[in-house]
C-alpha cells in the first residue's frame, strides 16, 4: 500500500500556537532547491500537492497533509536560502527549530538532499540538531537520475559511510530517489510506514509497572 497515496492538504500555519491537533506526524525538510516539493508530489502521486518552484525558499510556512491512515505528513520550510529579508529568515529558522524540537506528535524526519551535493554543512547541522530528539531520520538522495548508475552506487556508499557515526547512535537510513524516474517510492513507503507501525505498537502496548 502506498502510504502517501491520496494525501490531502489539511492546513498551513506560520506560528507554533496554530499547530493543529493530530495523531502522528512525519516531516519533510531539506535545503532550498533540494527537490523536497517534487519528492512529496511523487510520493503522493499528485502533480501539485506541494508547490514546486524554480525559486528557492518558496515554502515559507508549515504545511500539513492528511494521509489515508489518518496520520499526517508535514512539509517544512527549506533551509539555506539567504535571499530573503533577515527577519523573515530568522522567523523560518525559529519556526523550524521549535517545531522539530518540541512537537510531540512528530515521530520521524525525512531529510531531502540533492544526490549530487549530499551532506552539505547545513545538512550536517540539521542531523546534529535532530539527533537530540532521538527520533529516526530517513534521507532521500533526490535527483538521482542526474547521476549515472555507477555514480549512484558510489554516492550511496559514500553517504552511508559518512553517516556511520550517526547510525551508531540513532535510527538513520538513506536511499536514492528520483522524482523524474519514479525511483525509490516503495523503499520510502516501507521505511516511513515502519515508523507509524512502531509508534502504533508502542501506543497499544500495556505500560510497565
From Swiss-Prot:
- What's the protein called, per UniProt? Probable GTP-binding protein EngB
Q: Which UniProt keywords apply?
A: Cell cycle, Cell division, GTP-binding, Magnesium, Metal-binding, Nucleotide-binding, Septation
Domain EngB-type G positions: 22-198
Q: Which residues bind Mg(2+)?
A: 37, 59
GO cellular component term, pick one = cytosol
What role does this protein play? Necessary for normal cell division and for the maintenance of normal septation.
Q: Please give the InterPro entries that the UniProt record associates with this protein.
A: G_ENGB_dom, GTP-bd, GTP-bd_ribosome_bio_YsxC, P-loop_NTPase
GO terms for biological process?
A: division septum assembly
Against PANTHER family, the record matches this protein to: ENGB-TYPE G DOMAIN-CONTAINING PROTEIN (PTHR11649:SF13), MSS1/TRME-RELATED GTP-BINDING PROTEIN (PTHR11649)
Positions in coiled-coil regions: none
A GO MF annotation of the entry reads: GTP binding
Task: Name its species.
Answer: Neisseria gonorrhoeae
Family the entry assigns: Belongs to the TRAFAC class TrmE-Era-EngA-EngB-Septin-like GTPase superfamily. EngB GTPase family.
Name the coenzymes or cofactors required: Mg(2+)
Among the Pfam families in the record, one is MMR_HSR1
Amino acid at each position: 500500500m502506498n502510504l502517501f497515496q491520496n494525501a490531502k492538504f489539511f492546513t498551513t500555519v506560520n506560528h507554533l500556537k496554530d499547530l493543529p491537533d493530530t495523531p502522528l506526524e512525519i516531516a519533510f525538510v531539506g535545503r532550498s532547491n533540494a527537490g523536497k516539493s517534487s519528492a512529496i508530489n511523487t510520493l503522493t502521486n499528485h502533480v501539485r500537492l506541494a508547490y514546486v518552484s524554480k525559486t528557492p525558499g518558496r515554502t515559507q510556512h508549515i504545511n500539513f497533509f492528511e494521509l489515508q491512515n489518518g496520520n499526517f505528513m508535514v512539509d517544512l520550510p527549506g533551509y539555506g536560502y539567504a535571499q530573503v529579508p533577515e527577519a523573515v529568515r530568522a522567523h523560518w529558522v525559529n519556526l523550524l527549530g521549535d517545531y522539530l524540537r518540541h512537537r510531540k506528535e512528530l515521530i520521524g524526519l525525512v531529510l531531502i538532499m540533492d544526490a549530487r551535493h549530499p551532506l552539505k554543512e547545513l545538512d550536517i547541522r540539521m542531523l546534529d540538531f535532530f539527533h537530540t530528539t532521538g527520533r529516526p531520520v530517513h534521507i532521500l538522495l533526490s535527483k538521482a537520475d542526474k547521476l549515472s548508475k555507477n555514480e549512484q552506487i558510489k554516492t550511496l556508499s559514500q553517504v552511508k559511510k559518512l553517516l556511520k557515526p550517526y547510525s551508531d547512535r540513532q535510527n538513520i537510513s538513506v536511499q536514492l530517489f528520483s522524482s523524474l524516474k519514479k525511483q525509490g517510492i516503495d523503499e520510502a513507503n516501507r521505511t516511513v510506514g515502519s515508523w507509524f507501525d512502531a509508534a502504533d505498537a508502542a501506543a497499544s502496548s500495556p505500560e510497565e509497572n
